[in-house]
């Protein structure tokens, strides 16, 4: 899943527009997310492990906000021969087009239905696994509860939701420390102060992270009684919830 280096914010911008998953971002997304999200590779690899353990024969897997297909590829490698179908959804045509190319590079008997749509409009049924990988934080906060409810209803008993998100913290010293560590991570991966500042400004109005208790309360309210954080690095975490 090759991409060119992310230099989108390397030059000073007079006007910084809101972040969009457009063609420019899609072209550098693999590099961008690897250099911006600590533990991203570990999360992607472990999605395949979750699928191996939890995906049941003749069921469906939903990758909601599939971007370039990294999660779908990780899962598909581990479920061959189970008669399953993966439904991969993204509302960015540029992401879907590149995802299609990435998926076609690997031979597989597991079909992937690639859909360019808003994940809030997708019906979920017969699912043994649903993936929300750094996706929900871009939805309007008032729509998140409804989405989790729809996922819960569409999961088969024993099915899982894997939810990865950036977190915010009510404890201000903790928030400051983890934020600083994340910034150091980006600096160590070659991002300049200008790039970091401009990217943060572009995300300010479009990415609204929740606290961990907010995620937990939302999962519990919609019927999940078994859930836990399985991975965390700084202010990025991944949770698993079992129906």
From Swiss-Prot:
Q: Which InterPro entries match?
A: CmoA, Methyltransf_25, SAM-dependent_MTases_sf
List the Pfam families hit by this protein, alphabetically.
Answer: Methyltransf_25 (PF13649)
Q: S-adenosyl-L-methionine among the record's keywords?
A: yes
Q: Keywords on this record?
A: S-adenosyl-L-methionine, Transferase
Q: Which Gene3D superfamilies match?
A: Vaccinia Virus protein VP39
Report which reactions are catalysed by this protein. Answer: prephenate + S-adenosyl-L-methionine = carboxy-S-adenosyl-L-methionine + 3-phenylpyruvate + H2O
The reply on keyword Translocase is no
Cysteine pairs forming cystine bridges in this chain are: none
Cite the EC number. Answer: 2.1.3.-
Q: Which domain of life is it from?
A: Bacteria
The alphabetized list of GO BP terms reads:
tRNA wobble uridine modification
Family (UniProt):
Belongs to the class I-like SAM-binding methyltransferase superfamily. Cx-SAM synthase family.
Q: How does it assemble?
A: Homodimer.
Its function, per the record, reads: Catalyzes the conversion of S-adenosyl-L-methionine (SAM) to carboxy-S-adenosyl-L-methionine (Cx-SAM).
- What protein name applies here? Carboxy-S-adenosyl-L-methionine synthase
Q: Which organism is it from?
A: Shewanella loihica (strain ATCC BAA-1088 / PV-4)
Gene name tied to this protein: cmoA
């Amino acid at each position: 899943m090759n991409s060119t280096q992310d230099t989108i914010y390397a030059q000073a911008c007079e006007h910084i527009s809101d972040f969009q998953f457009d063609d420019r971002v899609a072209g550098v997304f693999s590099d961008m997310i690897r250099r911006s999200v600590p533990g991203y590779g570990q999360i992607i690899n472990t999605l395949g492990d979750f699928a191996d353990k939890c995906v049941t024969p003749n069921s469906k897997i939903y990758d909601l906000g599939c971007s370039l297909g990294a999660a779908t590829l990780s899962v598909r490698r581990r479920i061959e021969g189970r008669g399953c179908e993966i439904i991969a959804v993204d509302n960015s045509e540029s992401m879907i087009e590149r995802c299609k190319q990435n998926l076609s590079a690997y031979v597989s008997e597991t079909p992937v239905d690639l859909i360019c749509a808003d994940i809030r409009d997708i019906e979920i049924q017969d699912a043994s696994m649903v993936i929300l990988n750094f996706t929900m934080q871009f939805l309007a906060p008032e729509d998140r509860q409804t989405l989790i409810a729809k996922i819960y209803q569409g999961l088969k008993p024993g099915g899982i939701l894997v939810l990865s998100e950036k977190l915010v913290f009510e404890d201000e010293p903790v928030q400051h420390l983890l934020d600083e560590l994340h910034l150091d991570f980006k600096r160590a991966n070659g991002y300049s102060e200008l790039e970091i500042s401009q990217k943060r400004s572009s995300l300010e109005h479009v990415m609204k992270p929740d606290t961990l208790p907010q995620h937990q309360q939302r999962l519990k309210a919609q019927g999940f009684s078994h859930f836990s954080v399985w991975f965390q690095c700084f202010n990025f975490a991944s949770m698993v919830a079992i129906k």
